[in-house]
Amino acid sequence: MAQTCDLCGRGPAFGNRISHAHNVTKRRWNINLQSVRALVNGAGRRMRVCTSCIRNNKVQKVA
């Protein structure tokens, strides 16, 4: 599925956009996904991973 992390499964957050006149429309906050070459079962594979997984060393990058 689009806009989800391949490691943790985290996706976008949903909420409302509220104007000064208090008109309410739906909006979404997308996560920061980066395309990374990672080691999966000993082979390099391209994955879409969120930056929190990269920062917490949950992905092992291919050199």
Curated annotation (Swiss-Prot):
GO terms for biological process: translation. Keywords: Ribonucleoprotein, Ribosomal protein. One of its GO terms (molecular function) is structural constituent of ribosome. The keyword Chloroplast does not apply. GO terms for cellular component: ribonucleoprotein complex; ribosome. InterPro entries: Bacterial_rp_bL28, Ribosomal_bL28, Ribosomal_bL28/bL31-like_sf, Ribosomal_bL28_bact-type, Ribosomal_bL28_sf. Disulfide bonds: none annotated. Pfam families: Ribosomal_L28. SUPFAM superfamilies: L28p-like. Belongs to the bacterial ribosomal protein bL28 family. This is Large ribosomal subunit protein bL28. It comes from Solibacter usitatus (strain Ellin6076). The gene is rpmB.
